């Protein structure tokens, strides 16, 4: 389990834990009385299950392992894109799993082709996410911590 402050504030922290090959995230408001914003869960990346088409001797496979190292093995498939792997530690909202960055694979890539690095910073969602984060900072909608 890890708990750390999120970008830009020290009031709402992100908790991440793994149980039975799934990651779980919650937001924890740490000021005054601690409170929790329940979050999402996602299956931990398993190459054989999630990417059965991947050539294990390819550059893409090497790139995944490099990304795994840099993300401390906090990887999952993007639920909206079966060819994108995300680092679940960082998201716009601390109780969400919409990775700020990731890598994009192609099942049609030749064996020497690299992955593509991607960022998830939608301008359309930014204002809505900032409103939600502000409500979290104020403690609106949280449940008391046990």
Can you annotate each of these PLM segments?
Residues 4:
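Acidic carboxylate-rich catalytic motifs and surrounding loops in phosphoryl-/glycosyl-chemistry enzymes
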Residues 7-146:
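Extracytosolic and intramembrane catalytic regions of membrane-associated proteins
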């Amino acid at each position: 389990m890890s708990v750390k402050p999120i970008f830009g504030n020290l009031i709402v922290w992100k908790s991440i834990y793994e149980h039975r090959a799934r990651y779980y995230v919650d937001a924890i408001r740490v000021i005054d009385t601690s409170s929790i914003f329940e979050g999402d869960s996602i299956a931990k990346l398993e190459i054989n299950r999630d990417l059965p088409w991947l050539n294990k001797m390819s550059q893409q496979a090497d790139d995944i392992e490099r990304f795994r190292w840099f993300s401390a093995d906090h990887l999952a498939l993007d639920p909206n894109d079966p060819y994108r792997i995300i680092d679940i530690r960082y998201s716009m909202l601390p109780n969400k799993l919409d990775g700020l960055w990731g890598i994009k694979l192609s099942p049609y890539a030749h064996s020497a082709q690299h992955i593509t690095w991607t960022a998830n910073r939608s301008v359309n969602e930014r204002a809505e996410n900032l409103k939600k984060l502000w409500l979290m900072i104020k403690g609106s909608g949280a449940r008391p911590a046990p």
